[in-house]
Swiss-Prot record:
Basic and acidic residues composition bias: residue spans: 46-60, 70-81
Compartments where found: Cell surface; Cytoplasm; Cytoplasm, Cytoskeleton, Spindle
Protein name per its UniProtKB record: Hyaluronan mediated motility receptor
Expression sites (tissue/organ): Expressed in testis. Expressed in the breast.
Pfam families in the record: HMMR_C (PF15908), HMMR_N (PF15905)
Amino acid sequence: MSFPKAPLKRFNDPSGCAPSPGAYDVKTLEVLKGPVSFQKSQRFKQQKESKQNLNVDKDTTLPASARKVKSSESKESQKNDKDLKILEKEIRVLLQERGAQDRRIQDLETELEKMEARLNAALREKTSLSANNATLEKQLIELTRTNELLKSKFSENGNQKNLRILSLELMKLRNKRETKMRGMMAKQEGMEMKLQVTQRSLEESQGKIAQLEGKLVSIEKEKIDEKSETEKLLEYIEEISCASDQVEKYKLDIAQLEENLKEKNDEILSLKQSLEENIVILSKQVEDLNVKCQLLEKEKEDHVNRNREHNENLNAEMQNLKQKFILEQQEREKLQQKELQIDSLLQQEKELSSSLHQKLCSFQEEMVKEKNLFEEELKQTLDELDKLQQKEEQAERLVKQLEEEAKSRAEELKLLEEKLKGKEAELEKSSAAHTQATLLLQEKYDSMVQSLEDVTAQFESYKALTASEIEDLKLENSSLQEKAAKAGKNAEDVQHQILATESSNQEYVRMLLDLQTKSALKETEIKEITVSFLQKITDLQNQLKQQEEDFRKQLEDEEGRKAEKENTTAELTEEINKWRLLYEELYNKTKPFQLQLDAFEVEKQALLNEHGAAQEQLNKIRDSYAKLLGHQNLKQKIKHVVKLKDENSQLKSEVSKLRCQLAKKKQSETKLQEELNKVLGIKHFDPSKAFHHESKENFALKTPLKEGNTNCYRAPMECQESWK
């Protein structure tokens, strides 16, 4: 079998949108195309025509009131959309407030970190001060030990040297004595002729001895003066001990500062706990707001569904309202009474809004006044700080360590000023947030007023529509009364329609009650929101007051600390001036002693030279005396030798006395030199301590040399040259 060829366009329908099913005839279409083509039956034709007629009748029979009701329902849906937008705006505002609170929390955390850094710096300063105190105490202990050792060693070395010198002199004298005894036996005769010469020389030596005795008296007077000066030095040492007592007082102050630091740490921990609690509370509030948003969305969906149902019911019941205008007149009177009630409620709400607006204005004025007061206080504090800084700059030029502390305090004050500026910015932010909240409340109130005005307008339009419909219905009623005899059969249907209208009226009453309840709920919500915002405002005011009190306390504490530091600087400057004056007095007093020591050394050398010349003369006299006495009798020789021995013993005793006096003088001079070195802070190297000392001697000075102390190194150099 062979099939016919299909055309190119298979199953090709006409272009364009097809009509609705059942609204067209198959026969009126174009020629059928495709392999399968058959003619449909005409079973759907009558139903289609009937449905079209019904739809046309429905469209024509709908009155203008029903169309207006539909427009009112669209307006209600628009109102619901507006309410949702307003709620979304509120949610955004709350989220912005949450962001601002998070920023505040971050700022507080940064402030806590700064406080911790300051505490760490204070602890470091404390440790450095304690280390410096420990090193100073060690140095004092070492100096006392070195002084005791030097005293003991100088006394031992002096005795040993004197013993050695005396032993050597005794040996020499013994040798000389033996030589003299040998020469005396041979030279007694020559000595008798030279006795007169020796007597003259003895008289001259006696005169010299008298001069030496006068010098000894002057030396004793100088010793008395030196004792008085040593007493003064002991008084200075007592003052140094008083300074050590002050160091102990400073240690006690440091302990008190440690306790204060512990208290500050506890306060910081409490602040952290309060911050954590605030964060938890805010998170809970955010969760509650999210839950409220979900509930509002659900309510929106319910309202939309209800509106749809109401639209359907209203479309079904509007045809029955035409014949039953009598009941609607009664309902109209009731609605007029309700309108009066609504007007009274609106007036009350307007009065409340005006009172709230006045309260907000008064609150804003109070905030502005407080802000001005804060600015004036800040200006005063800044002026005082400038004055204090000028005073500090004048007072702290002498001591560098105190300058560094003042700089650190100035930096802390700058940080506090920055904090105050930040707090002012926070105040401005809080005021801005408050104004935003008030604006939002005003917007909500305006939206509510607009919604109420729209409701009243809708109600008035509905009244006008009902009046026009009532007039139409009156005309229709007159025509119906004329046709009442003819329409007797339709009386039962009319009664059913009356019952339906009554049910519809009841539903309208329910709708009005629902609207009233919703308006009451919204009013309560507005009141709750206002109360919550007022509570937040009061909380912010309390927080600001607390922060102001804290800042005032901090400023007072810092002013007290500054005053204490100024007092300490004044005391230190006074002590420095005292020590400078004492040092200058000591230096002026020690200058003549140094000159006297130089003069004593010159006299000592002259005496030693004279002693050598006298010994040479004695030797010559002895030789000549021995030559003279060589030929005389033994008795005379013996007598002369006895006299010479007596004179020799006297001379030896005088020489020993003079040596003892010289040794005492040397000891006193060494003691004075040691005390001078202690006062001037100069150390001399002791050879007995070589390679045995614990700490190095030539260490670098920690503090630089001050003005006026350039002569402190001349005295020891001159002393060293004089001892050389």
